[in-house]
Amino acid sequence: MKKRKSHIMSPAGTALVLLLGILLAAMTTLALEQGSLLSTLESFRAEPVLFVLNLWPMAAMALLVYFLLGNAWYSVSFTTLVWGLLSYVNLVKVEARGDPFVPGDILLLTEGMEAAGNYQLDMHWGKLALLLGLCLLLAFMGIRLKSSRPRL
């Protein structure tokens, strides 16, 4: 059986994948939020520093995972999945209770799961399926296209 060769991207290609992937993670996160994506982008256009401040945690995570794994596609896939799931949880919580997801809610996970039975939740299965499909596609790209290894 013939083994398929994986292609290795140039350092510029790897940097481009990381940059576009970070923007994709940000847009995915914003698209999962409650409200209009266009109105959110308009508010970022009025205050560009807000976009940068919202983007840097995703960029930091993507770069950290890239330096740990050495693959830009896996990094972008993981970053999109983590931030997308946080945005998805925020969407469901805002619709159910009217208040946003905060880090302290993680400590209340078991209590929240017990209380979830009291709510009629719209789980937005289509959005969740699209998020997971996108992350799987990005991970598959990591199998087919290898990134150049990070050098310090």
Residue ranges and their predicted role:
Residues 2-152:
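Transmembrane and membrane-interface helices of multi-pass
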